[in-house]
């Protein structure tokens, strides 16, 4: 059974978060032009720094664990790369994405020598560093994208890129850069992979909010706005997939997913509770909610002032129903401490926390309730 621990309560909603490799610092976006950095302080967390170089709302952030670099993207159509100096200060570098619409999503590649930025301009900017000119260069993936890119994920080979889009499609494209990447080995996705090769295109019943390659890279999972998760097992280039399995959920849509191992996927979204899906090429199923909302939890939140505040929950469904009935009939309400789940609102992002890519043992979640929660599988 999964256990949870509230690491920190942010003063604002969190739409994206990322930890450093030591898990001693994390950054978060809060629907402003700022990125907030928090660092561990004893048993709690304290605000350490604010990055405010963007002019408009920061839409996504990612932290490269090996190189310790942070990348951000924004509605101002640009990206920034932050590198930590030996004296503890951060050097920021502007990356021109050459977009005419907002940047929506960003992820470092596994080797951390490239990053990809989705956008509302129907293109993906693949950025890499040119040593000769000392700047970041962007190349555009365009074909066959027809709408806003909502999510991205890199294949373990550092070349293939999965994209979830608002045109109700999930794509697998080649982001091979000749001066950066070694020639990739042949796989089920193809052997000849020049830049912008379309390796696969899969349908969905709604916007594709999340995509993710399996640890082996031989399967792709994606979550649609129709409350479904689809797992695709490709067979060969330009051939129908060996299996295309769709799991229909009886809950609100998912926003984020990650592979715990080759046969388990953790996903979360508008339903406030992470869920576990398990299966293989023969079939997948939603096996359980990781937050059943049946046990009482308590935690202490330490803010910047150092004052602790203990909160307890949850309350029963009967109490919630009674409260809303009284508000409707009598115009009165009674105090309710919390909902029956650890998260009190939408879960926006899931991130691996402990384990290896093929065996994730713990992950973190953040959402619009401002909570950053650690889950142990």
Swiss-Prot record:
WD repeats: 9-48, 53-92, 98-139, 144-183, 203-242, 342-376
Gene3D superfamilies (alphabetical): YVTN repeat-like/Quinoprotein amine dehydrogenase
Cellular localization per UniProt: Cytoplasm, Cytoskeleton, Actin patch
GO terms assigned for molecular function: actin filament binding
Transmembrane regions: none
Predominant subcellular localization, coarse grouping: cytoplasm
Gene Ontology, cellular component aspect: actin cortical patch; Arp2/3 protein complex; cell division site; cell tip; cytoplasm; cytosol
Positions of the UniProt region annotated as Disordered: 293-313
GO-annotated biological processes: actin cortical patch assembly; actin filament branching; Arp2/3 complex-mediated actin nucleation; cortical actin cytoskeleton organization; endocytosis
The UniProt record lists the keyword Cytoplasm: yes
Described purpose of this protein according to its UniProt entry: Functions as a component of the Arp2/3 complex which is involved in regulation of actin polymerization and together with an activating nucleation-promoting factor (NPF) mediates the formation of branched actin networks.
Oligomeric and partner information: Component of the Arp2/3 complex composed of arp2, act2, arc1/p41-ARC, arc2/p34-ARC, arc3/p21-ARC, arc4/p20-ARC and arc5/p16-ARC.
Protein family membership: Belongs to the WD repeat ARPC1 family.
Cross-referenced PANTHER family: ACTIN-RELATED PROTEIN 2/3 COMPLEX SUBUNIT 1, ACTIN-RELATED PROTEIN 2_3 COMPLEX SUBUNIT
Protein's name according to its UniProt entry: Actin-related protein 2/3 complex subunit 1
Species this chain originates from: Schizosaccharomyces pombe (strain 972 / ATCC 24843) (Fission yeast)
């Amino acid at each position: 059974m999964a256990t949870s621990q509230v690491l920190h309560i942010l003063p604002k909603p969190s739409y994206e978060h990322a930890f450093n490799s030591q898990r001693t610092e994390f950054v978060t976006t809060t629907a402003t032009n700022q990125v907030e950095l928090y660092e561990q302080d004893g048993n709690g967390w304290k605000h350490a720094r604010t990055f405010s170089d963007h002019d408009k709302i920061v839409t996504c952030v990612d932290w490269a664990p090996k190189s310790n670099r942070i990348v951000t993207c924004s509605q101002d159509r640009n990206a920034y790369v932050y590198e930590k100096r030996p004296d503890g200060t951060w050097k920021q570098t502007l990356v021109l994405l050459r977009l005419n619409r907002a940047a929506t999503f960003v992820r470092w590649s596994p080797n951390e020598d490239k990053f990809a930025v989705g956008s509302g301009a129907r293109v993906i900017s693949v950025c890499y560093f040119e040593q000769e000119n000392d700047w970041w260069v962007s190349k555009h993936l365009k074909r066959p994208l027809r709408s806003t890119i909502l999510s991205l994920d890199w294949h373990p080979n550092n070349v293939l890129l999965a994209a979830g889009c608002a045109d109700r499609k999930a794509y697998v494209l080649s982001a091979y850069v000749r001066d950066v990447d070694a020639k990739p080995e042949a796989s089920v996705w193809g052997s000849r992979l020049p830049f912008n090769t379309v390796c696969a295109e899969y349908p969905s019943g709604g916007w594709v909010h999340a995509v993710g390659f399996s640890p082996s890279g031989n399967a792709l999972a994606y979550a649609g706005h129709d409350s479904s998760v689809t797992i695709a097992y490709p067979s060969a280039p330009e051939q129908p997939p060996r299996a295309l399995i769709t799991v229909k959920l009886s809950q609100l849509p998912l926003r984020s997913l990650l592979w715990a191992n080759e046969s388990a996927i953790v996903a979360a979204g508008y339903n406030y509770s992470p869920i576990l899906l398990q299966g293989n090429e023969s079939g997948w199923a939603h096996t359980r909610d990781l937050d059943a909302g049946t046990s009482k939890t308590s935690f202490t939140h330490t803010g910047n002032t150092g004052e602790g505040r203990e909160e307890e929950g949850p309350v029963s469904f009967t109490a919630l129903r009674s409260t809303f009935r009284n508000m409707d009939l009598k115009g009165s309400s009674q105090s309710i401490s919390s909902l029956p789940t650890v998260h009190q609102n939408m879960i926006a992002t899931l991130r691996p926390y402990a384990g290896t890519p093929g065996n994730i043992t713990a992950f973190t979640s953040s959402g619009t309730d401002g909570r950053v929660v650690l889950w142990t599988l």
